[in-house]
């Protein structure tokens, strides 16, 4: 089984202060402990929409990397966004399920 904190720590080693990171739910609390940053975008209260928020941010801010740390349930609630993301194909969007 994957250890979420170890996974997030591995991702954090590749994140810069200029990156926008969208952690969701359980991952959010761990992420804020591992890598606090003013550009962490918490989307609590919008379960299933982290991928949509990330796509909008990636398209609106092509000058920044956008990293979404999604949950499996959250992603399953909005699978259609994967089609939109694939069609838009932003080079600055990185989507992890952890």
Regions found by a protein language model. Name each.
Residues 32-97:
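Thiamine diphosphate
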Residues 1-47:
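Active-site diphosphate/adenylate-binding microenvironment
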